Structures are given as C-alpha cells and as structure tokens.
Amino acid sequence: MTNIRKTHPLMKILNNALIDLPTPSNISSWWNFGSLLGLCLITQILTGLFLAMHYTPDTSTAFSSVAHICRDVNYGWIIRYLHANGASMFFICLYIHIGRGLYYGSYMFQETWNIGVLLLLTIMATAFAGYVLPWGQMSFWGATVITNLLSAIPYIGSTLVEWIWGGFSVDKATLTRFFAFHFILPFIITALMIVHLLFLHETGSNNPTGIPSNMDMIPFHPYYTIKDILGALLFILTLLTLTLFLPDLLGDPDNYIPANPLSTPAHIKPEWYFLFAYAILRSIPNKLGGVLALLLSILILVFIPMLQTSKQRSMMFRPFSQLLFWTLIADLLTLTWVGGQPVEHPYIIVGQLASILYFLLILVLMPTASIIENKLLKW
C-alpha cells in the first residue's frame, strides 16, 4: 500500500515541500534562514493576534492600552516584547537571507528573487505600520516624517499625503487605518511566502558552489529537518534572551512618551532596521532626490540579476568579488550607524560617502570585478 503522505491531496503538497524534497547535499547553515523567517512570521502573527485582542486603535487610548497590556494582561508584557523584538529578529534573518542570496548567486532564480524583493517591501511596510501603533512620540513623528515623503511626488504629492492621513495631519483616522494595514499585511506576506516557495521548488535550491547539484541530492527529511530544528532552537534562545534580559535594547526611549503633536523629539529616527535607508534618504539635500534614492536603495535588488557579468554563479571562488561583498556589508553597517546619529558634521559627509559607495559597489565595482575575474580564468 502506498504511503498516505504520497497520495492524500493535501499531505502530498506538504510531503513534496518538506519531506521528500530533493535538496543539495552541501548547503550550509546560511540556508537555514528561510525556515527561520517562516518561524518569525508564525511568531509575529500569533503574538500580534493576542496583542490585537487588548489593543485599541484610538488616539486617546492607544498608548494606555499598550501600558494596560504590559501591566494588567496575563503575560501581556512578554507577548508585547516578543512581538517588538520578534520584528528585530525578523529583519536580522531577512538581511542575512538576502546577503546569502547575493553571495551565492541565488538571485539567478529570477522569479523567486523578485517575489523575495516584493516580500521585503511588504515586510518593511508592515513593520512601519506596526511602529506607529503604540502612539508614542517616535510613533507619531516617525509616521509624520515618513508619510510626508510622499509630498515630494510632483503634482499629486500633497493630496496623496492628506489622503493617506485621512485629514490634515497624522490623527485618529491615520492610526485606525495603520492598524488595519498592520493586521492584514502579515496574511498577504504569508500568501507571498507560499508563492516564493512555489517558485523555489520549481528550480530546486542553489548551493554554495553555484554548480547544478542534480546528481547529488538528498531528501529534506531527516537531514535538513534536524538542521532546521537546531537553527530554530538557537533562534528561540536568542529571541528569549533579548526579550527577557534586554527588552528595550533595540527600541527608542522616546516611544515611552505619549504622542504630542506640539513637541518634536530632538532626533526623529526609525527603528534600527530602517536606519541604512534613512541615512541614504538624509544624505541627499533635495527632497525628491532623497526619496528616489531611498526607493532605489531597496529596488536596486531587482536589477542585481541583470548586473551579473561573472561566468561563475557563486562568489565562493571569486576573491575580488568577496572583498567587495564584505565592503558592501561594512558600508551598510556604517550607514546604519550614521542613520542613528544627529544631522551634523562629521556624520553628514560620512553618510554621503557611504551612500555613494553603496550604489557604486552594486552598480559599477562588483560587475567590473566579475569581468576582471573572467579574464583571470583564461590565464
């Protein structure tokens, strides 16, 4: 008799995705982050659901409802901090996952890669909407500053901003709609994630060498299920350590002050995971130019498959490209640091140089290094 997992219509899908899936035998721990992102999404949806049961999306009660969750709801404090720090863990896993894709040439699976970029944008939108909900100072002013960027769009800009606000400033209508967006987007992310996996399973996984591994595949279960469980345990350990010992490490103290439209915080800045893009935005003195650079800093990922000039897919055997890749990582860390600093000397010039280097590395230096490496192969 054939096993039920291979015949049942629903179990067959799960079986082909998680059990009998042929997987390259040599994929490293950098391939663990896909499953960790799935775990992040489940954690965020569950904790978010329980928070939504007690939260009120109204300007007069939003801040106190979060305080009520932390003080009066059974284990509300841990649910709230798991959700806040879970978002940080989500972005850590996300950036490592993208970095892995860049290093090993996984972007050559173009459909998977483009859905991934769409996922990144959706997750960023969700995180931004979520940051507004506690209605602290940074929530209010962050929402004001970021939504105001749309006013840089010629002709329709200011109308568009007022349409998103639902009035002439960030107010009750804005908070209510941001709560609605924040609630619905994770389910859209889940749907996109399924499409992402669907496209991935059309081609199979890439591997560190970048060479097709069709002749050397092993079943996903038990080899990679056990590996993913180890990754998941380490992830849970990190998240719980962060939540229980340093819950406010990655947050902004200003968000413990209730939103006040009459008092602007000294330094308006987004959460740490947006600081690199914020630094690029700030480094251009022109408003529209800054907004375009901000968009391009993320959307540049879409063009990476087109910028592939190397004859080798992976960077495993390409020392020049490796050097430039790690320079890019250092540059992104520099941008993240600058984004959290006040707009004054020397941070302005450092931010501008780091922003130029970011685009230069991706658009010019890395494709050029690949061409040089191709020439060296002939020696």
UniProtKB/Swiss-Prot annotation:
Cofactor field: heme b
GO biological process, any: mitochondrial electron transport, ubiquinol to cytochrome c
GO molecular function, a single term: ubiquinol-cytochrome-c reductase activity
Keywords: Electron transport, Heme, Iron, Membrane, Metal-binding, Mitochondrion, Mitochondrion inner membrane, Respiratory chain, Transmembrane, Transmembrane helix, Transport, Ubiquinone
Gene3D superfamilies xref list: Cytochrome Bc1 Complex, Chain C (1.20.810.10)
Primary location class: mitochondrion
GO cellular component, one term: mitochondrial inner membrane
Cofactor info, note text: Binds 2 heme b groups non-covalently.
Protein family per UniProt: Belongs to the cytochrome b family.
Assembly description: The cytochrome bc1 complex contains 11 subunits: 3 respiratory subunits (MT-CYB, CYC1 and UQCRFS1), 2 core proteins (UQCRC1 and UQCRC2) and 6 low-molecular weight proteins (UQCRH/QCR6, UQCRB/QCR7, UQCRQ/QCR8, UQCR10/QCR9, UQCR11/QCR10 and a cleavage product of UQCRFS1). This cytochrome bc1 complex then forms a dimer.
Protein's name in the database: Cytochrome b
The organism's taxonomic lineage, starting at the top: Eukaryota, Metazoa, Chordata, Craniata, Vertebrata
